[in-house]
Design a protein with these regions (language model features):
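Mid-chain, structured segments of secreted extracytoplasmic proteins
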Residues: 89-122
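Active-site acidic/histidine proton-transfer and metal-coordination neighborhood
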Residues: 8-22, 31-39, 98, 114-217
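Histidine-acidic metal/acid-base catalytic patches
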Residues: 2-54, 58-68, 198-220, 224-308
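Active-site-proximal loop/turn and secondary-structure-junction residues that shape catalytic pockets
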Residues: 51-53, 81, 108-111, 153-155, ...
Length: 308
């Protein structure tokens, strides 16, 4: 082979190898350097601990910083009240420095099946009142304004109207504690099991109207709405003036948008058009493990958020 041809062929071969290498590059790395990386989303989606641990490590603060670099501007943390106080403060400081918002945390000391407000019993009411006071202190450390409350299970030996009245009275007492501090409890209708008292947004709507406080609103978790009844957009419209927060999760599977049957792109556009400016909590898992799954999650939100 002539030297000139050898050089040309070598250059072409090298270019081919380089191209192949680029095509085989780590898709996770590619996603974090995409053209829209860092650009804020149209809506304010809130990540949770563990969502980006493969990219950023186990430290939640490092995950928050990574999420910020990907365009996310808020977090939620169900277990915030269980974290050490110094960690709560560090998370709050990190959010403040980055200009990020704090979504919901779950009211301390309450479980889905242990907070029996429907019973009307003093022991459950006292525990609830104490948890409201503790929630105020947690919120101060993290500059939070939203706390998730679940009334607990049905009490089978009481008529439903009596149970509803008991829940309303308990929530009134709770809002009297948190309202002076600008805190809002968001009541979450759930689909986890048939024993739960609060299951539908219209039921939560009636309770909020009866309580009559700006510190009592609905947590509109679209995963639970889809499982319980569907009809997400019309139901949203019916209860919109009492919605204080949204949570996301596709169904079946409770993973990121695009992995199930819910048309989140249309729903996000509807929420945006309604003028909502708050946080939408990403209360779901990652459909795929590892960095690849985290990259797929980011892309899923970019796709669902591309409604403009």
């Amino acid at each position: 082979m002539k030297r000139r041809n050898f050089v040309q062929n070598s250059v072409l071969a090298g270019a081919s190898l380089l191209t192949a290498g680029l095509l085989k590059a780590d898709p996770a790395a590619a996603a974090t350097t995409a053209p829209d990386t860092g650009k804020p989303f149209h809506l304010n989606y809130g990540i949770h601990d563990g969502m980006f641990k493969n990219h950023a490590g186990d430290d939640f603060i490092d995950q928050i910083k990574f999420a910020y670099d990907q365009g996310f501007r808020s977090i939620e943390d169900n277990g915030m009240a269980r974290r050490p106080i110094d960690q709560q403060k560090k998370i709050g400081d990190t959010l403040a420095k980055l200009g990020m918002a704090m979504g919901v945390f779950v009211q301390p000391g309450l479980g889905n099946d242990t907070n029996l407000l429907a019973s009307g019993k003093a022991e459950h009411l006292d525990k609830f009142i104490a948890s409201c006071k503790e929630a105020v202190e947690v919120a101060k450390r993290i500059n939070g304004k939203l706390v998730t409350v679940v009334p607990g299970d049905f009490v089978r030996n009481l008529p439903i109207g009596i149970q509803t009245g008991n829940v309303i009275e308990a929530i009134k007492k709770g809002t009297a504690i948190i309202e002076p501090h600008g805190l809002v409890m968001v009541l979450e209708p759930l689909s986890d099991n048939p024993d739960l008292f609060l299951r539908t947004p219209d039921q939560a709507y009636a309770i909020c109207k009866a309580v009559g406080s700006p510190s009592c609103k609905i947590l509109y978790d679209m995963y639970h709405v889809q499982r319980n009844q569907g009809n997400i957009i019309p139901t949203l419209n019916w209860v919109y003036d009492e919605i204080g927060y949204y949570q996301i999760g596709d169904n079946p599977g409770r993973k990121e948008p695009g992995t199930g049957e819910v048309n989140y792109k249309n729903i996000f556009k509807h929420i945006y058009d309604k003028g909502y400016k708050g946080v939408l909590g990403m209360e779901h898992g990652n459909a795929i493990k590892g960095k690849e799954g985290e990259t797929a999650l980011i892309k899923a939100y970019r796709d669902a958020d591309s409604f403009m």
